[in-house]
């Protein structure tokens, strides 16, 4: 017997869609991304409820590897508004769920080069909270200026092409 059709999955509301909760825009500006990984996040109940309300901040967040486990530090998830004394600590360290081979590969790459683990986005995928984790290298000031100049040049090219197709030139 077949494992099931995709139509039943879509009807159940569990498609492959992502519902983005928070993004770390500064990470893409301050770091050059080498590789990305998707990791699950071990959360408490009130944290998930707070995330369902769309409340989180990745601004100061980073990941570390301690004793073969990956931890997400400084992720801010505010206390659940309707929670009681069982509410969570908003800045507690949260364990990331990765395969052992992925963790070993990350440990080797971080040890070899001057690399960091940065969270890029936090999202729901099929009802589970996931984080897009990037292996990244810090940019120098001149790298950031080059990126801005390239972006401005690309924007100008698109603007000129738009004028040409509209017959303004």
Curated annotation (Swiss-Prot):
Main subcellular location of this protein, as a coarse class: cytoplasm
GO terms classed as biological process: trans-translation
Keywords, in A-Z order: Cytoplasm, RNA-binding
Domain of life per record: Bacteria
Stored Pfam families: SmpB
Compartment(s) of residence: Cytoplasm
Gene Ontology molecular function: RNA binding
GO CC terms: cytosol
InterPro entries: SmpB, SsrA-bd_prot, SsrA-bd_prot_CS
Transmembrane intervals: none
Stored Gene3D superfamilies: 2.40.280.10
Protein function: Required for rescue of stalled ribosomes mediated by trans-translation. Binds to transfer-messenger RNA (tmRNA), required for stable association of tmRNA with ribosomes. tmRNA and SmpB together mimic tRNA shape, replacing the anticodon stem-loop with SmpB. tmRNA is encoded by the ssrA gene; the 2 termini fold to resemble tRNA(Ala) and it encodes a 'tag peptide', a short internal open reading frame. During trans-translation Ala-aminoacylated tmRNA acts like a tRNA, entering the A-site of stalled ribosomes, displacing the stalled mRNA.
Record-linked PANTHER family: SSRA-BINDING PROTEIN, TMRNA-BINDING COMPONENT OF TRANS-TRANSLATION TAGGING COMPLEX
Family under the similarity heading: Belongs to the SmpB family.
Annotated protein name in UniProt: SsrA-binding protein
Organism: Mycolicibacterium paratuberculosis (strain ATCC BAA-968 / K-10)
Designated gene of the protein: smpB
